[in-house]
Amino acid sequence: MLSKQISNLNSSSNKPKILSLFSGCGGLDLGFHQAGCETVWANDFSHWACESFRKNIGDVIVEGDIEQINPNDPTIPDCDIILGGFPCQDFSMIWKQPGLEGERGNLYKSFLRFVNAKKPKVFVAENVKGLLTANKKKAIQQIITDFENCGYYVQANVYNFAEFGVPQFRERVLIVGVRLDTGFDFRHPEPTHNETGENGLKPYVTAGQAISNIPQNASNNELLKISDKTRRMLELIPEGGNFTDIPKDHPLYVKGMISHVYRRMHRNEPSKTIIAAGGGGTWGYHFPEPRAFTNRERARLQSFPDDFEFVGSTTEVRRQIGNAVPPQGVVELAKSILPIFSDNYEKVDLHEKLVEEKEILFHDRLSKIRGGKQ
């Protein structure tokens, strides 16, 4: 039934229309496009991310500060879905967590403004797992409450994208809001992959599988320069290891280094999380070759197809890839939302469901969020 709905969407001009915010290079959009949707308007502040989006997703992106854009501007079309990964650095668990008090923490309010103005049937917001604990859990409570007050039934869930076919352990929170009057009983999808391939699931896609057979003429596949010292360090780190595997008595060992630097891939496992920020030690490293991943390898680990060409310098492209939502990771989520656009579903009273939900202590509501693999 669902595959028929997707086919019907793809064969018509009535594809669900996406309004995309904090779009980056377009990873989240691409995943929804692969499920049968299309983006009609998008926004991002980064020039080069906009150029990559324009080249691969479509010439519908507006470059500029979202806080200066009025969602009621007549040039912004109506939509069925609003997507966005509002900036996550202030919620990240890798760095300090200022949360809503950080410089970028309140940008979710721009997302909220668009949802309140456009009233799409559904919205999807992506963020780091640290959002769930930021400001002593007050941040996620405030965010969910604000969207509920706009007339949405909101459900958050932690996704480990390796469990959805991405060759990378990457945990992110996906917040889905369904407009109350739709009566659509949305459920977050169940994983499609696991470590063993048992219980009817597929085995994880491994890093070795993902980065094999890259054509020599593939775009964004330039080797990154590393120092001789870094190369010597990498030769001391085993497959799947990191800086802490360097012998403590070795001259290249530095006391106090943290384990997420100089991480080398394990060919038979998904890669560790691909990130955007940080120095060379956080780039992610090949095995058996003692070198950093190329940007095309990073893109494959983020599940981007080879014909997705990133625009900008090597450093800029690395940032775009690390900031992106892996497209494959949200395809099942997009598919689970599609029935809302067919009206071919059994409706529930979301107003009543929301009243019942609000009677539960927020701490208990949070405890229902499924956690991913550490």
UniProtKB/Swiss-Prot annotation:
Catalyzed reactions: a 2'-deoxycytidine in DNA + S-adenosyl-L-methionine = a 5-methyl-2'-deoxycytidine in DNA + S-adenosyl-L-homocysteine + H(+)
Keyword Ribosomal protein annotated: no
Positions annotated as active site in the UniProt record: 88
GO molecular function, one term: DNA binding
Domain called SAM-dependent MTase C5-type: residue spans: 16-344
CDD domains registered for this protein in UniProt: Cyt_C5_DNA_methylase (cd00315)
Gene3D superfamilies: DNA Methylase, subunit A, domain 2, Vaccinia Virus protein VP39
Catalytic EC class: transferase
Entries under InterPro entries matching the protein: C5-Methyltransferase, C5_DNA_meth_AS, C5_MeTfrase, SAM-dependent_MTases_sf
EC number: 2.1.1.37
GO biological process: DNA restriction-modification system; methylation; negative regulation of gene expression via chromosomal CpG island methylation
Keyword terms: DNA-binding, Methyltransferase, Restriction system, S-adenosyl-L-methionine, Transferase
Stored NCBIfam families: dcm (TIGR00675)
Protein name, as recorded: Type II methyltransferase M.NgoFVII
